[in-house]
Amino acid sequence: MSVAVETFGFFMSALGLLMLGLTLSNSYWRVSTVHGNVITTNTIFENLWYSCATDSLGVSNCWDFPSMLALSGYVQGCRALMITAILLGFLGLFLGMVGLRCTNVGNMDLSKKAKLLAIAGTLHILAGACGMVAISWYAVNITTDFFNPLYAGTKYELGPALYLGWSASLLSILGGICVFSTCCCSSKEEPATRAGLPYKPSTVVIPRATSDESDISFGKYGKNAYV
């Protein structure tokens, strides 16, 4: 049962990592909204790297942010957290692939595989946590500006990339928990194989006849029985 759980957790973490990569490259982290009586013909959408505008004809024009130092602090922080999440996810995916009991890499015993699974599960949990913090931090800034009556700039709504990122982070965390929870079970299996108990062959003991028994058996026959 634990083999199925750790395999399921491994693929769940891999799916979460893939979705985190798609979230980072998605253009729709936030989308401009029509707020109040102002009528606009352009739709603006942004992510962590660039901003785009779509006119009434459906033509989109994108431009990169001018300077990293000119960006808001939360955008730079979200960039760092998302990149960290993907790097941790890749490292956890590699260690988990080696530590799975259905794989045979380097003829490792179960105790070493259990340690690798524990590290891989921890990395996936940290990756999901980094992604969750980055997405939530970005969403909080969107909602803060949206409900601020003194904010005179363009107001945005949550883009579909944020919902994808939340789902990806949750999958990474759940997959990491599944992988981490099976490391104790895998280290306890096959104790006799890991202990290397010595083999003692069985011996057969043949009882020897005593002197009294030999005298009794000799007395059963008379002297005339021997030639």
UniProtKB/Swiss-Prot annotation:
Keyword flag Nucleotide-binding: no
GO biological process, one term: regulation of intestinal D-glucose absorption
Keyword set, alphabetical order: Cell junction, Cell membrane, Disulfide bond, Ion transport, Lipoprotein, Membrane, Palmitate, Phosphoprotein, Tight junction, Transmembrane, Transmembrane helix, Transport
Coarse class of the protein's main subcellular location: other
TM regions (residue ranges): 2-24, 75-99, 116-140, 160-182
Tissues in which the UniProt entry reports expression: Detected in duodenum, jejunum and ileum. Detected on intestinal villi and crypts (at protein level). Ubiquitous. Detected in small and large intestine, colon, jejunum, heart, kidney and lung.
Gene3D superfamilies cross-referenced by the UniProt entry: 1.20.140.150
Sequence ranges on the Extracellular membrane side: 25-74, 141-159
GO cellular component: bicellular tight junction; lateral plasma membrane; tight junction
Reported modifications of this chain: Palmitoylated when heterogeneously expressed in S.frugiperda cells.
Feature type site, description Important for Na(+)-selective paracellular ion transport: 55, 64
Family, similarity comment: Belongs to the claudin family.
Protein name: Claudin-15
